[in-house]
């Protein structure tokens, strides 16, 4: 069970605020201390999952860190849907994975933007005949 801090008790915060506070504490401190940056960890997981899917189904499935974060959100939704009883940590984990997914998407968008700017700045011809 996730414990409520004394500050949270004193401030009479809402459940949604407490959920986000705990998720933030877990994702931004506890998790990083144990596993490192989520995106780095999810990149490794994506390689394992892609290799498994390729081996099992004989198809190349490109996965990235964002895919792992999204699938972990779905995993948590499945847990919530089939749980015999309410467990708050499922919702806290769900919020944490959603935050990680957002960070992965933002980082990917930044890389795409930087590449696009470089192509435009250097007038690189990326038509199929020149690639």
Summary of predicted features, one role per range:
Residues 1-131:
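Intrinsically disordered, low-complexity regulatory regions
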